[in-house]
Amino acid sequence: MLNRIFSREAIFIVAVMWGVFLIDLVLPGISFNHLGIKPRNFQGLIGILFSPFLHGGFSHIIANTIPLLLLSGFVRLSIGPQKMLYVMSIGVLGSGLGTWLFSSGDLVIGASGLVFSLIGFLLADAWFSPTLRSWTVAILSFFLYGGALLSFFVYVPFISWAAHFWGFCSGLAIALSMRRSR
């Protein structure tokens, strides 16, 4: 049952996140977090690819691990494993590019842009390609993580609203581009 929900790809992403986090934690003087997104800095573009694997602390990585596993599993159940990889890849690129262009922060790390792209995709997929499965998954996703959307309206220090916002927008755009005929 779990192998139908949690894909090897999502487990691999989470394993890399935790591996990088543990290296940062255990080896003094080593930190990969400087590889995050540095907004509007040419060298910071590399952070678009690395940022989802970098986290600032235990609570940060936990806050991204659980939703990443669950939501990627919901995407997989809704549209299949191949399309899930597409959604996740474009979600990382879209949230990262939006964050790089528009964030007011100094350095942005974490997988929350990807998480929000998955939320945006699942909600929009139910709207643009309505099926019983897509609506069930969207309602469940909203029930579990809909409160996270409040981060668009509330300032929380050290949390990148830009990553959340552009991740969500990326998810909406992905669902729109993949909409199935009614």
Write out the residue ranges for each language-model feature.
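A detector for small-residue-rich transmembrane helices and their helix-helix packing motifs
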Residues: 1-182
